[in-house]
């Protein structure tokens, strides 16, 4: 078995990130329990690398992940596009109401 690597000139991307991308709600300096306004951020280890390489070095990056086709999924997609990362490899799945949202509280923040 041999590994065939194409030249860079034949590749669409410098990097494709594979992994989960999350939405983080940040209450700022206030406590999460009493906050009524939040700043929303996108994030996830693999995605952070793709966005960083795009912003710092101008590399062509994309993400391969799956999102529920609902308002939250589309909001995260918009954040990704604002970061200059390609979203054409996102798989959109219908939201059937059975998905679960996971929250972790740490020092007043939701991750």
Give residue spans per PLM region.
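Positively charged, low-complexity intrinsically disordered leader regions
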Residues: 1-37
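Conserved active-site and cofactor/substrate-binding residues in soluble primary-metabolism enzymes
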Residues: 13-16, 44, 48, 71, ...
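Short catalytic helix/loop segments, enriched in acidic residues and glycine
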Residues: 31-51
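Short, conserved beta-strand segments within well-ordered enzyme catalytic domains
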Residues: 39, 54, 62-64
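Alpha-helix C-terminal capping segments
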Residues: 48-60
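Conserved N-terminal subdomain of the carbohydrate kinase-like
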Residues: 60-111
């Amino acid at each position: 078995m041999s590994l065939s690597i194409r030249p860079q000139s034949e590749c669409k991307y410098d990097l494709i990130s594979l992994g989960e991308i999350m939405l983080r709600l940040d209450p700022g300096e206030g406590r999460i329990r009493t906050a009524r306004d939040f700043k929303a951020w996108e994030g996830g280890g693999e995605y952070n690398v793709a966005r960083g390489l795009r912003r710092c070095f101008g590399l062509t990056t994309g993400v391969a992940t799956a999102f529920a086709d609902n308002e939250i999924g589309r909001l995260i997609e918009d954040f990704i596009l604002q970061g200059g990362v390609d979203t054409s490899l996102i798989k959109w799945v219908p939201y059937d109401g059975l998905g679960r949202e996971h929250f972790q509280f740490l020092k007043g923040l939701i991750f």
